[in-house]
């Protein structure tokens, strides 16, 4: 217990991809598994999604998984969308025939046993952390391994924003000024450019200038799309 608590304490802020790998490797070693995978899916827009993966899975399996489109029928992925509790792979195999096929192919690539834990963010992000082994003869999946792994989930969930920003495969994040964010936030409340100008004590022309800059930075064609992207990207927090 001391080791996992120390791992969490030393990695409160994940500010690089190396930090993320260190946490995953550390936990993987603590629970005595060979392989780990952290996958995270999020929506930069309402119609598009991005997936970030950090793992040490065999390259042969990752290539087959991606080329075969297994993510769309993977029972672990489907489970993680709407659940929070861990799931053993042995239990997931029984879900449907697609699941049995995927796990059989995984076994052929050295991933013979394991478990996964769903992870959810505040803005609809979802993902999972999985641990696996190729040695089923001496593999004893006890509840302690699962419980230990669950302790890391709040840390990963807390750092989802940093992970999407600093992951090795992440796209560059737009940097908005305080005024641009302020204008978008008021626009999200239904205020016109003239009303926003009155509220923040500036000219309507200046407000439109901020809208134009925000749209360019966010890759939006108009202020309404910019508002959507700003909310999904965490620039505007609708809960505050």
Swiss-Prot record:
Residues 193-212 bind DNA. It comes from the Bacteria. InterPro entries: Sig_transdc_resp-reg_C-effctor, TF_LuxR_autoind-bd_dom, TF_LuxR_autoind-bd_dom_sf, Tscrpt_reg_LuxR_C, WH-like_DNA-bd_sf. GO terms for molecular function: DNA binding. PROSITE patterns: HTH_LUXR_2. One of its GO terms (biological process) is lactone biosynthetic process. Gene3D superfamilies: Transcription factor LuxR-like, autoinducer-binding domain, Winged helix-like DNA-binding domain superfamily/Winged helix DNA-binding domain. The keyword Transcription applies. Probable transcriptional activator. Binds to autoinducer molecule ODHL. Belongs to the autoinducer-regulated transcriptional regulatory protein family. This is Transcriptional activator protein VanR. It comes from Vibrio anguillarum (Listonella anguillarum).
